[in-house]
Regions:
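Phosphate-binding/catalytic loop of phosphoryl-transfer enzymes
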Residues: 1-50, 55, 62
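ATP-binding/phosphotransfer module of carbohydrate and carboxylate kinases, centering on a glycine-rich
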Residues: 2-4, 43-172
Length: 172
């Protein structure tokens, strides 16, 4: 196995809601008020007056699919939308792929904010994580974006290396 050990970790859950657990120096962060890791209530990148969870949840996948496809989503589950993206079920494949990509982008924005405080490995799980092939591109794009100063100087939005460990070509 790999001898590298990590003492700091951000564990992300994508599913009914958007959650996180934070480990710093091998200790679970609970916070003084039991609020350690409350990523769900971070500012939403797209809808800045809403919480992040409105764009990073099962309901977000359904809402975005409905908006993009123009189809009724009352009886669709995220698994159904995943199956549409895969071509297993009929529906608007492009809207299905984009609904997961947008979830990834919005989750990525919140994860970037969290990583400014917690310099550690990110592990992602949860019920919606099964759609990783559609979520991770938007997430990685967001985490690799640049940000600038008024003078026009650009910086990577994260100062640490960002790689997807599911893609062997991305890490050494």
């Amino acid at each position: 196995g790999n001898p590298k050990r990590y003492k700091n970790l951000l564990g992300i859950t994508l599913g009914t809601g958007f959650g996180a657990g934070v480990v710093i120096d091998n200790c679970l962060l609970t916070g003084d008020n039991g609020c350690g890791g409350d990523v769900w209530i971070m500012r939403n990148k797209k809808y800045t007056d809403l919480i992040a969870e409105e764009s990073v949840s099962i309901r977000a996948v359904r809402r975005v699919y409905g908006e993009l496809s123009g189809e009724a989503v009352d009886n669709l589950t995220p698994k159904d939308i995943y199956d549409i993206a895969e071509g297993i079920l009929t529906g608007n494949r492009e809207a299905a792929v984009r609904s997961f990509d947008e979830l990834g982008e919005m989750a990525g924005a919140a994860i970037v904010s969290a990583l400014h405080i917690v310099d550690g490995m990110v592990v992602i799980g949860g019920g919606v994580a099964g759609a990783a092939k559609y979520i991770l591109p938007g997430m990685m794009r967001e985490m690799r974006r640049s940000i600038s100063t008024f003078s026009g100087r650009d910086f990577d939005c994260l100062q640490m290396e960002v790689c997807n460990l599911m893609e062997p070509d991305e890490y050494k």
